[in-house]
Amino acid sequence: MSRIGKRPIPIPAKVSVAIDGRLVSVKGPKGELSRELPSGVVVTQEDGNIIVSRADESRLARQRHGLSRTLVANLVEGVDSGFQKRLEIIGVGYRAQVQGTTLILNVGYSNPVQIEPPEGIQFVVENNTNVVVSGISKEVVGNTAARIRAVRPPEPYKGKGIRYAGEVVLRKAGKTGKK
């Protein structure tokens, strides 16, 4: 049995869960999320916990068991406390700012790069070089952070670019000159 899938998901006090077949809707202090789970899994609510189990023992159901449990757990955590991803901008003259809701990145291109946030996502810029992407959906927060990083990924020679906080960038030695 899936070790992740068999763990129950505790429901926090301020969160309400509605299960309608394969559709799971979660409402909490930060907002509301819903997701349709893949076939082959059954979701039930028992005394303050959500339990994800398999409909049968097929290979597909076994594959989707742990995935479905994690997806539901992310819904519950998102509406209760939310998610955030931090990015660092490294490079001389590289900086970020927020204008209204739009993130504006000056990262060495001739024009600044403007990034509009998807619905439910907020950008916060700390001291011009740190960007915090926050929201209630882990998937959307991660995808938005990846889009920002893709504007100028860290390069291996000087390490300039946009990276996740704590990301280790492998550095390369430059060419050695001929003597």
Swiss-Prot record:
Molecular-function annotations in GO: rRNA binding; structural constituent of ribosome
Keyword RNA-binding applies: yes
Keywords: Ribonucleoprotein, Ribosomal protein, RNA-binding, rRNA-binding
Pfam families in UniProt: Ribosomal_L6
PROSITE patterns: RIBOSOMAL_L6_1
An annotated GO cellular component: cytosolic large ribosomal subunit
Keyword Cell cycle recorded: no
Disulfide pairings: none
One GO process term, biological-process aspect: cytoplasmic translation
NCBIfam families assigned to the protein according to its UniProt record, in alphabetical order: L6_bact (TIGR03654)
Primary role: This protein binds to the 23S rRNA, and is important in its secondary structure. It is located near the subunit interface in the base of the L7/L12 stalk, and near the tRNA binding site of the peptidyltransferase center.
Family, as annotated: Belongs to the universal ribosomal protein uL6 family.
HAMAP family recorded: Ribosomal_uL6_B (MF_01365_B)
Record protein name field: Large ribosomal subunit protein uL6
Organism listed in the record: Synechococcus elongatus (strain ATCC 33912 / PCC 7942 / FACHB-805) (Anacystis nidulans R2)
Organism classification: Bacteria, Bacillati, Cyanobacteriota, Cyanophyceae, Synechococcales
Gene name linked to the record: rplF
